[in-house]
């Protein structure tokens, strides 16, 4: 049962299927990150303060369930492997939870709304964790070849960028079409459509991928020992720091984006135009990861370079807007997305290599456990970014569906440009210190293979 040839090559269909997994993830999670906050405040009628509190509370929930799910995936035994069965079982459940999350009842009392919001969102996050952690870990289980892993992650990122582009272009028109009489009906209908896409993509990923890297049987290892091993894995710690910053910048900005176009630019339809302008640069940027990696032979340095230019181009966007300087604004948007897409490919390509380094350094291989903390780091960044945005907007007088005051508009503009721009540059500095290059990685893999043989 292997999708990996003896020379470590992975069939094209398996790479495509793996990419489809992230198509599904983005039709769920990017819909949530881009539209859930404005759905809560402007459609469901929940206060900014309650939304901000939820974003922070949910990360405590993640701190509990992410490592547990990661550990459980490592211990899973089935004829389909350790990680693939989770896609088959958890994907349809998560699709149902997505629909429940976007089931608005604005006529309920505020306390009832908040209780429903907390329960459905926390269950959705748990469901997504049960899909995304095994999905992310699966790449490392498909092959140990560093170049093949780069190709698999490029396939993942290209597919993800296409999915994000399509989602961003069609979502606002779909919400308008299905919500012409009621905004809550529009959101619910779109959630049903995207939930079906989410489940179908993961079924395809399950069917056409295989786990080829065989992990030796080992005795039960405590969480304490696994944490100690993780703390000795320097490349992994840098990747984790990068993921925290990545989550803060990506999801904080995504939560702001519809507010930005609706209130700062004054026209929510600009969001669709913006999305159309960034889809092609997204795909090209993802495809450019491999040639740049071949040049630098270091995935961390590759990610660092992409992050640096993402930050510079995002900072430049502060000086322009879609209403008065559309050509420059949309050109900079495309440039920003090009560099971001390259970074997105690189940062996820790093993670499987850190697993091999950790096994070489400590003698312990715990793919799912390590990916769980990567996922947690990303979600912590997301929590801080979205909660901070919601908290600031609420504090300075945001009123749903009304003209906003100057301070609120300023917060929305900076959250879209300068704040994430600076944080991208910080991310570039952090990942510059990633030392695990291609030559050293291949030496480590050979040592591990020889050690297992002996």
Description of each model-found segment:
Residues 2-454:
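Membrane-embedded alpha-helical bundles of multi-pass transporters/translocases
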């Amino acid at each position: 049962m292997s999708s990996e040839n003896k020379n470590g090559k992975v069939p094209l269909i398996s790479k495509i299927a793996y990419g489809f997994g992230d198509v599904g993830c983005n039709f769920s999670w990017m819909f949530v990150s881009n539209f859930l906050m404005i759905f809560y405040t402007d459609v469901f009628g929940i206060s900014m303060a309650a939304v901000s509190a939820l974003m922070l509370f949910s990360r405590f929930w993640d701190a509990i369930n992410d490592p547990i799910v990661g550990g459980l995936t490592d211990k899973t035994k089935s004829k389909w492997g350790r990680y693939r069965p989770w896609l088959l079982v958890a994907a349809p459940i998560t699709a149902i939870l997505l629909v429940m999350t976007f089931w608005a009842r604005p006529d309920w009392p505020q306390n009832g709304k908040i209780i429903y919001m907390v329960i459905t969102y926390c269950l959705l996050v748990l469901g997504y964790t049960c899909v995304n952690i095994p999905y992310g870990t699966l790449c490392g289980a498909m092959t140990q070849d560093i170049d093949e892993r780069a190709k698999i992650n490029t396939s993942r990122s290209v597919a993800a960028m296409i999915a994000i582009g399509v989602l961003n272009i069609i979502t606002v028109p779909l919400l308008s079409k299905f919500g012409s009489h009621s905004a809550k009906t529009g959101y619910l209908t779109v959630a049903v459509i995207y939930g079906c896409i989410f489940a179908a993509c993961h079924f395809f990923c399950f069917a056409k991928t295989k786990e080829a890297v065989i992990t030796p049987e080992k005795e039960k290892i405590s969480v304490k020992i696994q944490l100690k091993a993780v703390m000795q894995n320097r490349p992994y710690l840098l990747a984790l720091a990068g993921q925290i910053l990545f989550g803060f910048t990506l999801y904080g900005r995504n939560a702001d984006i519809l507010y930005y176009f609706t209130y700062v630019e004054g026209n929510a339809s600009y969001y669709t135009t913006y999305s159309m302008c960034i889809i092609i640069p997204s795909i090209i940027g993802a495809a450019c990861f491999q040639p740049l990696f071949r040049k630098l032979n270091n995935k961390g340095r590759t990610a660092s370079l992409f992050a640096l230019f993402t930050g510079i181009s995002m900072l430049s966007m502060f000086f322009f807007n879609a209403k008065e300087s559309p050509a420059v604004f949309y050109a900079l948007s495309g440039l920003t997305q090009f560099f971001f897409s390259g970074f997105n490919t690189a940062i996820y390509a790093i993670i499987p290599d850190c697993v091999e380094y950790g096994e070489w350094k400590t003698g312990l291989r715990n793919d799912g456990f390590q990916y769980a903390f990567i996922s947690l780091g990303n979600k912590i960044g997301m929590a801080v970014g979205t909660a901070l945005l919601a908290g600031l907007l609420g504090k300075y007088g945001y009123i749903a569906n009304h003209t906003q005051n100057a301070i609120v508009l300023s917060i929305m503009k900076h959250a879209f440009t300068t704040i994430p721009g600076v944080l991208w540059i910080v991310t570039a500095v952090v990942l510059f210190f990633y030392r695990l290059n291609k030559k050293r990685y291949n030496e480590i893999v050979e040592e591990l293979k020889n050690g297992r043989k002996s």
